[in-house]
Amino acid sequence: MKDTSLPSTAGVVNKLIDSLGKLPGIGPKSAQRLAFYLMRAPEDQVISLSDTIRNIKNQISQCRICCNVADSELCPICQNTKRETNKICVVEQPQDILALEHVGVYRGYYHVLHGAISPTEGITSQNIRINELMVRLDNGQVEEIILATNPTTEGEATAMYLSRLITPLGIKVTRLARGLPFGTELEYADDVTLSRAMEGRQNF
């Protein structure tokens, strides 16, 4: 990683710049701007931010049903009894739910795998939340599984694996339409593309 420290800046500021620069999507210049913004910001705002970051580690866990992030036993989506109980959309990461919810065309529930099958990285089906998904299918309420894993080599491998597991159960398995460019992560797709991919999903 490129050194973001500034020789003319106090050590504690350089430490902050370095820490911010380790965040995804934050380059050296952005890290410096954020650091100096925090220096100028009101103390209560900085303390509130610090407390919130600390609470993420202390208070956030996983929903016992869908494995989404939650600050109680169930995430807000699983608490919502007005959603369609016969559909589950399977995604790789919690941020994929945010992207799909922002589009607003899907009203079923979700399941978060927290990863994708990747033999090159040593990630197998046992390392992601597939067993938890299969348990959810035992109640006979689910009629459709929507595979919304990323259009990557790992995402496709995971989708194929899940399809082979679920199809024999008599549950309809669909995949997001091919509007997403290969190699794209779901969270970075624009709303129009995601909407078309969800509405045009195909049997898989």
Curated annotation (Swiss-Prot):
Belongs to the RecR family. Keywords: DNA damage, DNA recombination, DNA repair, Metal-binding, Zinc, Zinc-finger. NCBIfam families: recR. This is Recombination protein RecR. GO terms for molecular function: DNA binding; zinc ion binding. It comes from the Bacteria. One of its GO terms (biological process) is DNA recombination. Disulfide bonds: none annotated. May play a role in DNA repair. It seems to be involved in an RecBC-independent recombinational process of DNA repair. It may act with RecF and RecO. It holds the Pfam family RecR_HhH. SUPFAM superfamilies: Recombination protein RecR (SSF111304). The keyword Zinc-finger applies. Gene3D superfamilies: 3.40.1360.10, 6.10.250.240, RecR Domain 1 (1.10.8.420). The keyword Lyase does not apply. Residues 86-181 form the Toprim domain. A zinc finger (C4-type) spans 63-78.
